[in-house]
Amino acid sequence: MAEQNLGPRDFFAKEDAIADLGLIACPGAEELCKLVDSHLVRWAREVGNTDVDSFIIPSDCPRFQSGDAKGLVKASTRGDDLYIFVDPGNYSVTYQLLGYENHLSPDDHFQNLMRLIQAVAGRAHRISVIMPSLYGGRQHRRVSRESLDCAFALQQLRDVGVKNIITFDAHDPRVMNAVPTMSFDNVMPTYQ
C-alpha cells in the first residue's frame, strides 16, 4: 500500500470544506489550544487563506461567589466544526471561594467542558473533544461496588452531541467500548 502524504491544501481547500473550523479552550487548556491554532493558521496561510487570524472562539467559565460556574461562548458557533480542548489533569487552574484559593479538580474540568458544550446549544455542525488525559481513565474496570466514571463520562459526552474524542495514551483503551458508535482516537506517544 502506497504511503499517502497529506499537506495543508488537503485540509484547507474551500471546495472540500464541510464546515468552518472553530477551537474552544476550557480553562487550563488555553496553551495547548493556542499551539494547535498557530499551526492551523500557518497551514491555512500556506494555501492562500490569508483572512484567518485565529480559529479560537473566545470562551470563559466564570465562577460565582457560591462556587457555581457557567460556560460562556463569546462568538457564534453556528455550523462550525468545533474542537474543544480540556485538560482534566491540570491542577494549576485556581479560583477563589470564600476567601480561599481552590484548585480545579478533574471533576471541575469535566463540568467546565459540559458547560461549554451546553453554551454551544447544539448549533455546531460537529463537536470533537481533545482531552490529553482521559477523564476518569485510571479507573477502567469495576472491582466491587464502585462507579465507572470514565465510561459514564464518555456516554454523557455522546448524549450531549460530541461526535469524536481524541486522547493520548489512555490507561485502558478498551473504555471506548462504552461508546461503540462514537469515534474514539487514542493517540500513542510512541508513534511520534
List PLM regions with ranges.
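PRPP-associated nucleotide enzymes
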Residues: 1-192
